[in-house]
Amino acid sequence: MTRHNNDLDWMLRAPELLALTRHMSTHELMSRMTVYNGFDYKKTHRLGVYFEQLWQHLTSQCNSLNIISHNLQVIIDKHTFGEFDSLIYDSVLDTHLHCELAVKFYLQVGSGTQLSHWVGPNLRDRFDNKHERLFEHQLALSKNPTIKPWLKAQDIKVDQVKVLTRGRLFYPLDSFMKEQFRFPREVNPQHLKGFWTTWEDFAHLQLSSSIEWYILPKMYWLSPVTGDEVQDLSLLDDRAILIHGHNERYEFQRIQQVVGMREGKEIMRGFVVTDEWLEKAKARVKSSD
């Protein structure tokens, strides 16, 4: 299978990131979907856009679903109110659906029990802010009194809203190794997990294990890496990190997602962060208090 097919399969089978009610979940919907060849990949460097492409392909191949619109912007009197990720008619349930999509990756910097203790790798994104926007704004678009007449004028119905959440939470290395996971009640207990650590501690992890480590480009952040794919990835040399760890020319002077491989199989993945990133992340979490 190609990476795209693996990612399509991952989208279908990976656990939800959030704990969703049956009413909100897309699980029943996706149980009718199948991975077919012919994915029309439009090159992008934005993982969220790629995630939308995967969803659009899966829904287009499902006979019981009719696509009304994807990425429909709501513009009223030159003001943009938001965007509907996916509007679909489900012929099995005779229901018009508004589906929102979210693929997110957060690192635990606080104690972990609050959404605000989790920050994105770029530091601009924080879990509590995303959660609030998703449920208070994006999923509520069709209920907005200003937008209701606009939808009617477009002859668009919304009977039910659903959300598809995928992604991974990254725990401090020690917690990850001991399987001591503390996460918010809004999170699905079966969510995908990874670790994070500093470059200095990561160098010691490399030396103490037989795992080969590779840098993961963003387009490899979804499905597990296969043995055939490692030839396309950059191998992290433990000696180079120890010798050149303070040289700004090297990859490891910024945050990177890495994957550990053994005998052609993915063992674990995580983020390796700089000291500067960690200080900024702590300040980002503290600002929520």
Task: Tell what function each PLM region has.
Residues 1-289:
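Intrinsically disordered, low-complexity Ser/Thr/Pro/Gly-rich regulatory segments
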